[in-house]
């Protein structure tokens, strides 16, 4: 005989035939009875009624659990439980009974029980209660429409617990504030679709384990600090911490990009040296120095932001976060001296101050740090000398002989040379490269090698 426990041990899969009780294939008489419609009232034959309900109700829920879904519709269940071309005629009655017992809940009713104002209604994530269902209720007809979306209450709670554990075991849990988009990506394998993900968040919100806020067009989620704690409302400190986290990511990406640009400028200067193009090499070195100064300026801001976040991550209570954040914002102002905002006496003023500093960061990232970049010609010459020395260990010509390599090495210029000496050494360097680059006195113009 089939039981929910036995069905739970069956192998998983998308084919319901592998998940159904033994009598599904073995007992034609019983299956014919189970596929027949319920009597209009249980009082007519309570034994038959209870037998059918005891078969279908647990099967509907266990099937949904195995499929990993929390939302179900009558039409989907009818398709899933087809047998030899027939559909169960009593499934609508089963769903009505589960609704009456509170094991199922209409999706629209569930949403009405929780503050769902943050959900993007405009993009069609959820639909309002169908008009057909509303009219049916008014007329006293309690049949479940085939397209009506129902929520399995216990399965939703299980899914919410799964998502909460997933968050707790991820790097996102370093601080309770997280972007909704990041959380959605984390839960992609657990929640099969966007509707399920939003329902899970609403359930966690109902349990007071999360709260959701829209900030500058982007939704952020705040988690409770412990599995048994209640989440506190999103406040200005939470918003400020979230902005700091976004600034850290932005600055880190920009520093990485500028580091790659610096290496590219250095390589261009090295190639120009090998090609005998001193002015081009100097221009590349100047670009490299500009980039390095930008990196240095951004690193200072990044270090400050990371220091604030480190103190916040180490905080265990909202008051400690508050204190760490207040202290951190003051330090951030000192590190960004161009910010001209009067000293704040309240947290709101400090939040505004942080926004001003972030504007400065954005301007820095957009336009670069160019003020005060006076290049020392002697320093550039020194770096050019170093690049010339580097070329001795990385000759480009594949046609060099051992003797040419020796000549190349012996022609390395000494540090701190004058422009005239540098020109002479560059001339020697060009000749040592197998004559690929002629001297300025050569009567014939040759093509430069392709690098």
Curated annotation (Swiss-Prot):
Pfam families: Snf7 (PF03357), WHD_CHMP7 (PF25239)
Modified residues (Phosphothreonine): 409
Cellular localisation: Cytoplasm; Nucleus envelope
Coiled coil location: 248-312
GO BP, one annotated term: late endosome to lysosome transport
Modification Phosphoserine occurs at: 232, 411, 432, 442
GO cellular component: amphisome membrane; autophagosome membrane; chromatin; cytosol; ESCRT III complex; kinetochore; kinetochore microtubule; lysosomal membrane
Keywords: Coiled coil, Cytoplasm, Nucleus, Phosphoprotein, Protein transport, Transport
Main location: cytoplasm
Family: Belongs to the SNF7 family.
Task of the protein: ESCRT-III-like protein required to recruit the ESCRT-III complex to the nuclear envelope (NE) during late anaphase. Together with SPAST, the ESCRT-III complex promotes NE sealing and mitotic spindle disassembly during late anaphase. Recruited to the reforming NE during anaphase by LEMD2. Plays a role in the endosomal sorting pathway.
Subunit structure: Interacts with CHMP4B, but not with VPS25. Interacts with LEMD2 (via C-terminus).
UniProt protein name: Charged multivesicular body protein 7
Native source organism of the sequence: Mus musculus (Mouse)
